[in-house]
UniProtKB/Swiss-Prot annotation:
Gene3D superfamilies: 3.30.1430.10, Ribosomal protein L3, domain 3, Translation factors. This is Large ribosomal subunit protein uL3. GO terms for biological process: translation. Belongs to the universal ribosomal protein uL3 family. PROSITE patterns: RIBOSOMAL_L3. It comes from the Eukaryota. One of its GO terms (molecular function) is RNA binding. It comes from Aspergillus fumigatus (strain ATCC MYA-4609 / CBS 101355 / FGSC A1100 / Af293) (Neosartorya fumigata). Disulfide bonds: none annotated. The gene is rpl3. Pfam families: Ribosomal_L3.
Length: 392
């Protein structure tokens, strides 16, 4: 008769308790990179929308490794990043209890997609948000606005830019833009405030924040799975086949005393839709939406865009700038992703390696052939009946 061990490592991590639904849909930056006044003034984060995944082929550049200068295949995630629009600046002062916002200065003109963020029901509202505030920019040549900016320069130590996405440029049906604070690092406080003021109502391109071969962090809310049992939620072992009243359970949930179930015991409940930060994703490429060959390489010179044949499944076409990062990131397609510069200087060979892509797969992600472009498919298949019907 077989026997089992009486002790085993626990199943599942207790590091992410409580496993409950995230309070906010957008990933929140809880820590920004440390400020260095010696560096030039720059932004430290951005936002984008997850489009999907694809495959790339490249030569590994890692001297000493067995695969050095050999082709490897890697999975990448495409995140569509239309330019952000800066609409405000916030100044923070340091107190014994942490940072406290001193004042917020808003731009004169705000688009409707960000104004929707301030209303529960945009359709029934009077849409009067910021009409009174906008007059401050005209009164006395914006003296009150200048006064608030000077207060930030005088008292604050941390400066953050308020920026929102241009969600209307994506295939999403949602009309309400996502708004976030992006910390400004580098230079003096006065330099930071002037930098933020000059960004008002201007687009912020993704390549002005991140660059190729950089390591970044992706903050998002994971895919939700609803109420799940203990086996799938915690990875506990299934009980033997002849077990009474169910197999996918925990056989013993605790001792007689203490006479309650301890918090460390694996239980059924909410799985997924958790706030997570995925660290150290290498940027393989930053593509421009205006470039007709933004998925072409020196090895594959065919003119093709990053959108695969038939579009990204459950997303559509990527018509704007995009960022390609190595591996998978949290969240489902269409979900907003918060992209942040890494918190620590990266020194590993993987981080410092220069990546040169040889080929990017743009075939259908729905299983209809391996054709990379419509022209390639037409050349192979010839004239089809549906083409004749369409032309007629």
């Amino acid at each position: 008769m077989s026997h089992r061990k009486y002790e085993a490592p626990r199943h599942g991590s207790l590091a992410f308790l409580p496993r409950k639904r995230a309070a906010r849909h957008r990933g929140k930056v809880k820590s920004f990179p440390k400020d260095d006044p010696k560096k030039p003034v720059h932004l430290t984060a951005s936002m984008g929308y997850k489009a999907g995944m694809t495959t790339v082929v490249r030569d590994l550049d890692r001297p000493g490794a067995k695969m050095h200068k050999k082709e490897i295949v890697e999975a990448v995630t495409i995140i569509e990043t239309p330019p952000l629009v800066a609409v405000g600046v916030v100044g923070y002062i340091e107190t014994p209890r942490g940072l406290r916002s001193l004042t917020t200065v808003w731009a004169e003109h705000l688009s409707d997609e960000v104004k929707r963020r301030f209303y529960k029901n945009w359709y029934k509202s009077k849409k009067k948000a910021f009409t009174k505030y906008a007059k401050k920019h005209a009164e006395e040549n914006g003296a009150s606005i200048t006064r608030e900016l000077e207060r930030i320069k005088k008292y604050c130590t941390v400066v953050r830019v308020l920026a929102h996405t241009q969600i209307r440029k994506t295939p999403l049906k949602q009309k309400k833009a996502h708004l976030m604070e992006i910390q400004v690092n580098g230079g003096s406080v006065a330099d930071k405030v002037d930098f933020a003021r000059n960004l008002f109502e201007k687009p912020i391109e993704i390549d002005s924040i991140f660059e190729k071969d950089e390591m970044i962090d992706v903050i998002a809310v994971t895919k939700g799975h609803g109420f799940q049992g203990v086996t799938s939620r915690w990875g506990t072992k299934k009980l033997p086949r002849k077990t009474h009243k169910g197999l996918r359970k925990v056989a013993c949930i605790g001792a007689w005393h203490p006479s309650h179930v301890q918090w460390t015991v694996a239980r059924a409940g909410q799985m997924g839709y958790h706030h997570r930060t995925s660290c150290n994703h290498k940027v393989f490429r930053i593509g421009k939406g205006s470039d007709e060959g933004n998925a072409s390489t020196d090895f594959d010179i065919s003119k093709k865009q990053i959108t695969p044949m038939g579009g990204f499944v459950r997303y559509g076409e990527v018509k704007n700038d995009y960022i390609m990062v190595k591996g998978s990131v949290p969240g489902v397609k269409k979900r907003v992703m918060t992209l942040r510069k890494t918190l620590y200087p990266q020194t590993s060979r993987r981080a410092t390696e220069k990546v040169e892509l040889k080929w990017i797969d743009t075939s259908s992600k729905f299983g209809h052939g391996a054709f990379q472009t419509p022209e390639e498919k037409r050349a192979f298949m010839g004239t089809l009946k549906k083409d004749l019907v369409t032309s007629a």
